[in-house]
Amino acid sequence: MAEISRIQYEMEYTEGISQRMRVPEKLKVAPPNADLEQGFQEGVSNASVIMQVPERIVVAGNNEDIPFSRPADLDLIQSTPFKPLALKTPPRVLTLSERPLDFLDLERPAPTPQNEEIRAVGRLKRERSMSENAVRQNGQLVKTDSMYGISNIDAMIEGTSEDMTVVDAASLRRQIIKLNRRLQLLEEENKERAKREMVMYSITVAFWLLNSWLWFRR
């Protein structure tokens, strides 16, 4: 129900707007005046036929038609020819040794011997600095390689020493086990030898006692 009433209200609103609002036939800017109104009505037929965009807008007061000359700056702009701009395509790779920074100049002065000498000296300085930088970088690379090799050797020595300690501990443990076994065998042999000696000693003593008793019986 609310939707139907809303649609009806919108239809009535749009119908009222279309009936009451009209585009005016003319727009009045000046205050109401009989002379202006009459002149305006006389010139409406001519002014309403073709509408042209004026060349310039001139603001004048008190209904005065002040003659203005063509602006000087417009004549100057139209009379001044445009110079073509010289644009150069930037190179893909910027190399200071081959292309110095003065390649951006569009118009170079005539080369002089002094300028050539200055450029040659600057080029030599750049090449010397580049070679020194290359040698320095190579020296740093050699140093880093040597340091890396030394560190690798130290790491290998430490690793081998650790491995050696592990191997030594294992071998020592095996040797200790072997020594324990040999000591146990020696102890058992000593016990058996002591038993044999006791038996032999008792037999010898018994033999001598028997011989002495027999000798006394005779």
UniProtKB/Swiss-Prot annotation:
Record localization: Mitochondrion outer membrane; Peroxisome; Cytoplasmic vesicle, Secretory vesicle, Synaptic vesicle
Membrane topology, as annotated: Single-pass type IV membrane protein
Transmembrane segments: 199-216
Cytoplasmic compartment segments: 1-198
Keywords noted in UniProt: Coiled coil, Cytoplasmic vesicle, Membrane, Mitochondrion, Mitochondrion outer membrane, Peroxisome, Phosphoprotein, Synapse, Transmembrane, Transmembrane helix
GO molecular function: protein homodimerization activity
Pfam families associated with the record: Miff
Stretches in topological domain Mitochondrial intermembrane: 217-218
Positions where Phosphoserine occurs in the chain: 129, 131, 146, 171
Residues of the signal peptide: none
InterPro entries per the UniProt record, alphabetical: Mff-like_dom, Mff/Tango-11
Major localization listed first in the record, in broad terms: mitochondrion
GO terms (BP aspect): mitochondrial fission; positive regulation of mitochondrial fission; protein targeting to mitochondrion
Modified residues (Phosphothreonine): 89
One GO location term (cellular component): mitochondrial outer membrane
Coiled coil: 167-198
Known partners and oligomeric status: Homodimer. Interacts with DNM1L. Interacts with C11orf65/MFI; the interaction inhibits MFF interaction with DNM1L.
Family: Belongs to the Tango11 family.
Function: Plays a role in mitochondrial and peroxisomal fission. Promotes the recruitment and association of the fission mediator dynamin-related protein 1 (DNM1L) to the mitochondrial surface. May be involved in regulation of synaptic vesicle membrane dynamics by recruitment of DNM1L to clathrin-containing vesicles.
Protein name per its UniProtKB record: Mitochondrial fission factor
Gene name per UniProt: MFF
